Regions:
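HIT superfamily nucleotide-processing domains
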Residues: 2-146
Length: 146
C-alpha cells in the first residue's frame, strides 16, 4: 500500500507518468503541470490535469502548485469549448479516501460535455455510461500538443 500522506510517493503512478516511466496520451504540458487522457474509458474525452510537483490532494498541496493546476484546468477547458465542439465541462476532484480519491497525487478530472450528451440532465452531475470511441481518436481531437 503506497504512503497516502506527505509529499513523497515513490510508487505514485502519476509521478511515473511525469518522469516518462509510464506512457500517457498528453493533451497539454508546461513547466508545472501535465494533462493527459484518462485511460478509464468511462466517457469520451475524459482528461486529467496534475501538478508535476507531487502532493496528495488539495488539502496537502501548496498554493503555487494548486494555482498552476487550476490555470491548466482553465486552459484545457477553454480549448475543449472553443476548439473541439464541446458546450461545457465538468471539473471533478476527490480529496482523500472518504471522498473517493484512489490515486494519491492531486488530480482534476475534466469531463467534456455537450447538450443532450446522455450523461445527465443539465445541471446534474454526469453519469458515465462508457466511452463510445477509441481513446486514440478522441486524443487526436483534443490534444493541444502539436
Amino acid at each position: 500500500v503506497p504512503e497516502r500522506h506527505g509529499n513523497k510517493m515513490d510508487n505514485c503512478i502519476f509521478c511515473k507518468i511525469i518522469k516518462g516511466e509510464l506512457p500517457s496520451r498528453k493533451v497539454y504540458e508546461d513547466e508545472y503541470t501535465l494533462s493527459f487522457m484518462d485511460i478509464a474509458k468511462d466517457v469520451d474525452g475524459h482528461i486529467l490535469v496534475i501538478p508535476k510537483e507531487h502532493c496528495k490532494n488539495i488539502l496537502d498541496c501548496n498554493y503555487e502548485a494548486l494555482r498552476h493546476t487550476i490555470d491548466t484546468v482553465k486552459k484545457v477547458s477553454n480549448h475543449l469549448t472553443e476548439n473541439c465542439g464541446y458546450d461545457g465541462v465538468d471539473v471533478l476532484n476527490a480529496n482523500d479516501e472518504s471522498a473517493g480519491q484512489t490515486v494519491y497525487h492531486l488530480h482534476m478530472h475534466i469531463i467534456p460535455r455537450r447538450y443532450n450528451d446522455g450523461l445527465g440532465e443539465v445541471g446534474e452531475w454526469p453519469s458515465f455510461p462508457g466511452a463510445k470511441y477509441e481513446i486514440e481518436e478522441i486524443h487526436k481531437q483534443v490534444t493541444m500538443i502539436k
